Every structure is written in C-alpha cells, then in structure tokens.
C-alpha cells in the first residue's frame, strides 16, 4: 500500500545537523575557531550522508500523508517514525475525534479505535498529519539517539583528518625502495566503517 507525503513544516539546515560543532572540535582536540566554518560544512555533509545511508529523514518535521482505500488495514504504518505527535486525522473528509485513534510512536503505527478497542481502518481516503523524527543535539530537549550523533562526529573527524590525502591510497611506506598500496575504488563522501556500524539499527531495510 502506497501513500503520498507532503512536508508541511520542514526542518531548517541547522535543525538537520546530527551533531554539534563543539562535539566535533572535542573529538579533534581543536580549541580555536579557525576551522569552524569548514567543520560546520562537513557536519552538514555528514548529516546528509547519514540520512541517505539510513534511507530516511532523521530530523523532526511535520508532514501530511494521504492513503487511498485503506479498508481492512490494521494498523496503518506511517512512512516516518518515531512519531512524536499526531496533529490530526481525516477520514473521508471528516476530522476524526482524538479518541478514535492512537499511535505507537516508536514503530510509526496508527491504530483505529472503536470503544477503545483496536479495529481495522475503513476509509476510501485517509489523511494523517503528524510530527516525526528526532530533535537534533543543537535543539532544546534533543531526542536524537547517541549512536546517530556519534556516527556524525566520527565521519566529520575522519573527513577533516583525511583532507589533502589521496583517497585512492591505502598506505605508503618508505623502507629502502619504498612501497604503496592502492584501493580499487574510492568515494570521498563515503561514511567511515565505524559510522556505518553505529547506524546499522537505524537503516530502513528493503522489503
């Protein structure tokens, strides 16, 4: 079952940053402000790469999602999660009372309630507006899991340390005549293995 999704309140660039500048500078043992602009740019790049790697929007946004012919569906699975709040539900053009549905936020499930019991949805058109995702570390009351934030810090630190290096060069040793080792392919935007490991539980798996 497919749906159409519209973002009604998008996260700003700053509210998409999955780690703080302070955390990155602490990781790199940098006290000066000389590199702040460059590091912030790397944070933006890492945040985008992590969202792409996880195949989901991580920052908190409010969206409107519409389904057609959901009769027999139990529960409705929202495209984004975790869900922090349901703004409203409209069933065949009629706003539903708040006591006729409930959400399982961590799973992104939306249940229809009849006399406080869970039942299958019966609707030709169902529209749900909800807020989903996490509040990032720079926001008040941040909710982003530490693993995601740590993955961003690791990626930024690795990219910063690797600046100026040949991305195709694995190692280079000088002992007598010297030696070099080259990798077959390289992607300067690739996330480090440690970051990928930290993110494994947050990746959306293909059906």
Identify the function of each model-found stretch.
Residues 1-207:
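Divalent metal-cofactor coordination and adjacent catalytic microenvironments
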């Amino acid at each position: 079952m497919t749906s159409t999704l519209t973002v009604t309140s998008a996260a700003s660039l700053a509210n998409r940053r999955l780690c703080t500048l302070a955390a990155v500078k602490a990781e790199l043992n940098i006290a000066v402000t000389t590199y702040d602009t460059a590091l912030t740019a790397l944070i933006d790049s890492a945040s985008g790469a992590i969202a792409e790697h996880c195949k989901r929007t991580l920052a908190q946004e409010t969206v409107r999602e519409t389904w057609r012919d959901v009769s027999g569906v139990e529960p409705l699975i929202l495209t984004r999660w975790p869900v922090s709040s349901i703004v409203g539900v409209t069933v065949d053009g009629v706003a539903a009372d708040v006591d006729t549905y409930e959400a399982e936020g961590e799973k992104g499930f939306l249940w229809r309630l009849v006399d406080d019991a869970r039942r299958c949805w019966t609707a030709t058109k169902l529209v749900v507006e909800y807020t989903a995702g996490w509040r990032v570390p720079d926001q008040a009351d941040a909710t982003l899991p530490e693993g995601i934030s740590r993955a961003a810090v690791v990626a930024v630190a690795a990219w910063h340390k690797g600046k100026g290096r040949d991305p195709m060069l694995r190692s280079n040793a000088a002992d007598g005549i010297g030696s070099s080792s080259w990798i077959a392919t390289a992607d300067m935007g690739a996330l480090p293995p440690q970051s990928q490991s930290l993110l494994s539980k947050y990746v959306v798996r293909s059906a």
